[in-house]
Amino acid sequence: MNFNKAEFVRSYGEYSQLPPSDRLELAFAGRSNVGKSSLINKIFNRKNLARVSAVPGKTATINYYSLENIYLVDLPGYGYAKVAKSDKVRWSGLIFQLIDMRHPPTADDMQMINFLIESEIPFVIIFTKADKLSKRQREERMAGFAQEIPYFSDIEHVEFSAENGEGADKIRNIICELAESGNDDIG
């Protein structure tokens, strides 16, 4: 899979505007300013494919990116939680749940994780901004996440840095596995 050939498809302002789903869609969810757009740029090896802003909530649209036979979907903040159940099925291939590694999960993070567990939607947690912590701080936060997140030991997770690319290859491998297998649960 050639990640350099990913293309921005379109932004949608409302869920009702989404076209019928004709291929596997993998979604990126997380609070505003957690680094979803930066992650997309890093895994696609592009600096400006997804617009990045220091202002929280700047991504207010649902942004679609095409990568060969799949779509990657950048969801606005926690907008995914407000979608009708019928629309959630379209992103049931996998949700990448992004959490800022520097902080404990927010109430919204926990609500989303619990929703994904209860709905049996496969997901991977991506801990962003890993480069902002020392090795010791990272170990402490991972121990904290193990206490704070239910079933943590059973959930696939990736420590990621948009600055140095740590974790990007692992995320690409997950995407490739899903693209090859179609819609299988990897976690």
Regions found by a protein language model. Name each.
Residues 58, 70, 77-80, 102-104, ...:
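Conserved nucleotide-binding/hydrolysis micro-motifs of P-loop NTPases
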Residues 22-23, 41-43, 86-87, 110-114, ...:
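Short, glycine/charged-enriched secondary-structure capping and boundary segments
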Residues 88-155:
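Conserved C-terminal guanine-recognition region of P-loop GTPase G domains, centered on the G4
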Residues 78-89:
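Nucleotide-state-sensitive switch-loop elements of NTP-binding domains
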Residues 1-80, 180-181, 185-187:
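Conserved G1/Walker A P-loop phosphate-binding module
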Residues 40-46, 66, 96-97, 131-136, ...:
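Low-complexity, flexible helical/coil segments
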Residues 49-51, 83-84, 100-104:
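Short, flexible loop segments at the rims of nucleotide/cofactor-binding pockets, characterized by
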Residues 3-16, 132-187:
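Canonical P-loop GTPase G-domain recognition
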